């Protein structure tokens, strides 16, 4: 294994419930049942990739080496899934807000879903524009059901590659080998969101300077292998396992050497999500 030093996506070094849903599609007819998102609109949807690599000097944040590899890999992966990919590089917090607002005001009525990937520095609840932090909730709120009507009842995925704190995970040895019939149905405005975080709350998120982040590497690999076979939550579970078992940090600083990472999925999806139909 090459000794490429591993970095973290933080500003500087200085009660979730889950549920299991069974069944999804009719294997005989291929028709969607009520527990599976309708993904056969004319378009799969937009995939916005915000790739922040270089930051203003007054922020004190370092350049995120390896992130361009992630952005290219993500673009290829989601284009192969028939998404319209829009790449945005080195955006300030104001530019990110403007971008998200404008995208939320587009007509998504012919689109099956929406994806936003953010590659940046971060902390718990915030991600960084090139000139400073912004609350993630402010960005995602533009796509709530009461603000973005054309995405109501459709899956909205936010994939976040960023630190969520400064805790380190040393690991432990183990012995063990839309279509809602909306005419008369009311749904929560926060429904149908999914947040795929690169790391658990409070922890660093690791990134290899040449190969990109562990999480994005694993996500793209699992999507390429399973997007036409498995439901999305099952894919993300495989991503979790791959990151947890196949990666360990390498650093010349003993404090940051041989550390582990586990991604975190927060789902408000109300149906199963398949990228095929």
Curated annotation (Swiss-Prot):
GO terms for molecular function: cysteine-type endopeptidase activity; endopeptidase activity. Inhibited by BIRC6; following inhibition of BIRC6-caspase binding by DIABLO/SMAC, BIRC6 is subjected to caspase cleavage, leading to an increase in active caspases. Heterotetramer that consists of two anti-parallel arranged heterodimers, each one formed by a 17 kDa (p17) and a 12 kDa (p12) subunit. Interacts with BIRC6/bruce. It is found in: Cytoplasm. The modification Phosphoserine is found at residue 26. SMART domains: CASc. The modification S-nitrosocysteine is found at residue 163. Belongs to the peptidase C14A family. PANTHER family: CASPASE, CASPASE-3. InterPro entries: Caspase-like_dom_sf, Caspase_cys_AS, Caspase_his_AS, Pept_C14, Pept_C14_caspase, Pept_C14_p10, Pept_C14_p20, Pept_C14A. The modification N-acetylmethionine is found at residue 1. The keyword Phosphoprotein applies. The modification N6-acetyllysine is found at residue 11. Its EC number is 3.4.22.56. The lineage of its organism: Eukaryota, Metazoa, Chordata, Craniata, Vertebrata. It catalyses: Strict requirement for an Asp residue at positions P1 and P4. It has a preferred cleavage sequence of Asp-Xaa-Xaa-Asp-|- with a hydrophobic amino-acid residue at P2 and a hydrophilic amino-acid residue at P3, although Val or Ala are also accepted at this position. Keywords: Acetylation, Apoptosis, Cytoplasm, Hydrolase, Phosphoprotein, Protease, S-nitrosylation, Thiol protease, Ubl conjugation, Zymogen. The active site is at residues 121, 163. This is Caspase-3. Cleavage by granzyme B, caspase-6, caspase-8 and caspase-10 generates the two active subunits. Additional processing of the propeptides is likely due to the autocatalytic activity of the activated protease. Active heterodimers between the small subunit of caspase-7 protease and the large subunit of caspase-3 also occur and vice versa. S-nitrosylated on its catalytic site cysteine in unstimulated cell lines and denitrosylated upon activation of the Fas apoptotic pathway, associated with an increase in intracellular caspase activity. Fas therefore activates caspase-3 not only by inducing the cleavage of the caspase zymogen to its active subunits, but also by stimulating the denitrosylation of its active site thiol. Involved in the activation cascade of caspases responsible for apoptosis execution. At the onset of apoptosis, it proteolytically cleaves poly(ADP-ribose) polymerase PARP1 at a '216-Asp-|-Gly-217' bond. Cleaves and activates sterol regulatory element binding proteins (SREBPs) between the basic helix-loop-helix leucine zipper domain and the membrane attachment domain. Cleaves and activates caspase-6, -7 and -9 (CASP6, CASP7 and CASP9, respectively). Cleaves and inactivates interleukin-18 (IL18). Triggers cell adhesion in sympathetic neurons through RET cleavage. The keyword Kinase does not apply. GO terms for cellular component: cytoplasm; death-inducing signaling complex. Residues 1-9, 10-28 form a propeptide. One of its GO terms (biological process) is positive regulation of neuron apoptotic process.
């Amino acid at each position: 294994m090459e000794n490429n030093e591993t970095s973290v996506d933080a500003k500087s070094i200085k009660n979730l419930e889950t549920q299991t849903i069974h069944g999804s599609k009719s294997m005989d007819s291929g028709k969607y049942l009520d527990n599976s998102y309708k993904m056969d609109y004319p378009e799969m949807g937009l995939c916005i990739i915000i790739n922040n690599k270089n930051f203003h000097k007054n922020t004190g944040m370092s350049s995120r080496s390896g992130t361009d590899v992630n952005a290219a890999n993500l673009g290829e992966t989601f284009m192969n899934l028939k998404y319209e990919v829009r790449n945005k590089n080195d955006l300030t917090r104001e530019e990110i807000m403007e971008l998200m607002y404008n995208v939320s005001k587009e007509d998504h009525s012919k689109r099956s879903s929406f994806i936003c990937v953010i590659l940046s520095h971060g902390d718990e609840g915030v991600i960084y524009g090139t000139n400073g932090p912004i609350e993630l909730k402010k960005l995602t709120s533009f796509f709530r059901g009461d603000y973005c009507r054309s995405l109501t009842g459709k899956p909205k995925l936010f994939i976040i590659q960023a630190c969520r704190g400064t805790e380190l995970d040393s690991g432990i040895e183990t012995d063990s080998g839309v279509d809602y019939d909306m005419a008369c149905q009311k749904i929560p405005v926060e429904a149908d969101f999914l947040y795929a975080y690169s790391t658990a709350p409070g922890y660093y998120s690791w990134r290899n300077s040449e190969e990109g982040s562990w999480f994005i590497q694993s996500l793209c690999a699992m999507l390429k292998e399973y997007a036409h076979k498995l439901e999305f939550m099952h894919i993300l579970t495989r991503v979790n396992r791959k990151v947890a078992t196949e990666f360990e940090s390498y650093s010349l600083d003993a404090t940051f050497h041989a550390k582990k990472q586990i991604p975190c999925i927060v789902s408000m999806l109300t149906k199963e999500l398949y990228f095929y139909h």
